[in-house]
A protein has these predicted regions:
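Conserved serine/cysteine hydrolase catalytic core
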Residues: 194-259
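Active-site loop/oxyanion-hole signature of alpha/beta-hydrolase fold enzymes
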Residues: 18-19, 26, 55-58, 68-110
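Conserved HGGG/HGGXW glycine-rich cap/lid loop of the alpha/beta-hydrolase fold
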Residues: 27-76
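Catalytic histidine-centered segment of alpha/beta-hydrolase-like enzymes
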Residues: 275-284
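Alpha/beta-hydrolase fold catalytic core
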Residues: 1-40, 63-64, 285, 291-300
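Conserved hydrolase catalytic core segment
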Residues: 105-144
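Conserved alpha/beta-hydrolase catalytic His-Asp/Glu region
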Residues: 161-216
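Catalytic histidine neighborhood in serine/cysteine hydrolases
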Residues: 263-274
C-alpha cells in the first residue's frame, strides 16, 4: 500500500486576510512508480475532500504519480476570508497554481462533480492540457432540482457528540453513493470529520454554500447563460474523455450524458448501476474502469 502524504502550497492572495493562504494536496508516490513524471490529478465534489480518492490512487500509484487536491475551504486547505470567492474561477486559479508547482510532463484529470466542472473549465479554456479526462457524474447541464437538494444541506454546520454519530449522519446524507461495506463507509467518512471542543464537526467551511444562497425555484437566465458557457468549454475539450454516470443520478440526466458522447470531447459513457450522485470510485468495478482508461495506450 502507498501511504498518502500531505503537502501545502503557499498562495499569495491579496484578497485573503494576511495576504496569503495554504492550499493542501495529497500525494501517492509509489517507490517503483513506472511513470512518476505523469501526474493523475484528482479533484473532489462540493463538500468532499482529497482522501475520497485513496482507493483509486492505490490502484494507480504503481503506474502514475497521483495527486489529489483539498479545494479551498475543504480538508486541510485554508478557508477563504470572503465567502463570495467560493466559486469555480477561484478553484481554477488555485488548481492551475498547483499544476505549475507540480510541473508534470503529462497530466490526466479525474473530477467528481465539482471537480469535473473545474477540469472542464481548465481544459476547455486552454489554461491546461491533459492526456485524458475522467468526469464523474457531472456535465455542462446540471439538473436544477438536484442543485436545490444539495443547496439545502451544504450550508449546515452540525456538531456530533461522537465520531460514530458523525459517520452515521454522513452515511444517511450520502445514501445515493450506493451500497458500501461498514469499512468502506468508515474510510469515506472519517476524513470528513474534525474534532471540536464539544464534539465533531464537518471538515468544510459552511460558507461554501454561498453560491446557493437565494437560489430561485426554477432555472433563471443567469443559470441558463452559465450552462451555455459550460457547453462551450466542454465542446473545446479534445482529449480522450471517460464519463461516469450513476444510473440513479439526479444531477446528470441520461439526455445530457448522451449529448456528451456526441459532441465536444465525445466522451465514452459508462453507467454505474444502483448508484445515484455520485459513484465513489471505491468499488472494484468502478476503480477498474477508471484505471484501465487512464492507463490505456489509446488515451494518447
Amino acid at each position: 500500500m502507498t501511504k498518502p502524504t500531505l503537502h501545502h502550497l503557499t498562495l499569495t492572495d491579496s484578497l485573503q486576510t494576511g495576504g496569503q493562504r495554504q492550499l493542501a494536496w495529497w500525494q501517492w508516490q509509489h517507490p517503483a512508480c513506472a511513470q512518476p513524471e505523469h501526474v493523475v490529478l484528482a479533484v473532489h465534489g462540493l463538500t468532499r475532500q482529497a482522501l475520497d480518492f485513496d482507493v483509486l490512487a492505490q490502484a494507480l500509484a504503481p503506474h502514475r504519480r497521483v495527486v489529489a487536491l483539498d479545494v479551498a475551504g475543504r480538508g486541510h486547505s485554508d478557508w477563504l476570508s470572503d465567502p463570495a470567492r467560493y466559486a469555480v474561477p477561484t478553484y481554477v486559479a488555485d488548481t492551475l497554481a498547483l499544476i505549475q508547482h507540480l510541473q508534470p510532463r503529462e497530466l490526466s484529470w479525474v473530477g467528481t462533480s465539482m471537480g469535473g466542472l473545474i477540469g472542464m473549465a481548465l481544459l476547455g479554456s486552454g489554461a491546461a492540457q491533459a492526456r485524458a479526462l475522467v468526469l464523474n457524474d457531472v456535465g455542462p447541464t446540471l439538473e436544477w432540482l438536484a442543485l436545490r437538494r444539495i443547496g439545502a444541506y451544504v450550508g449546515q454546520a452540525p456538531v456530533f457528540a461522537t465520531q460514530d454519530e458523525g459517520m452515521n449522519h454522513l452515511a444517511l446524507l450520502h445514501a445515493s453513493f450506493g451500497a458500501h461495506s461498514p469499512e468502506q463507509w468508515r474510510a469515506l467518512s472519517l476524513p470528513m470529520l474534525r474534532p471540536t471542543t464539544n464534539g465533531w464537526r464537518l471538515h468544510y467551511d459552511p460558507a461554501i454554500a454561498q453560491a446557493f444562497v437565494g437560489m430561485p425555484q426554477t432555472m433563471d437566465q443567469a443559470a441558463h447563460d452559465a450552462q451555455q458557457v459550460l457547453w462551450a468549454l466542454y465542446d473545446a475539450i479534445a482529449c480522450p474523455t471517460l464519463l461516469l454516470r450513476g444510473a440513479q443520478s439526479d444531477l446528470l440526466s441520461p439526455a445530457t450524458a448522451q449529448a456528451m458522447t456526441q459532441r465536444g470531447a465525445r466522451a465514452t459513457l459508462h453507467t454505474v448501476a444502483d448508484v445515484g450522485h455520485a459513484p465513489t470510485l471505491v468499488q472494484p468495478a468502478q476503480v477498474e474502469v477508471v484505471r484501465d482508461f487512464l492507463l490505456s495506450p489509446v488515451a494518447p
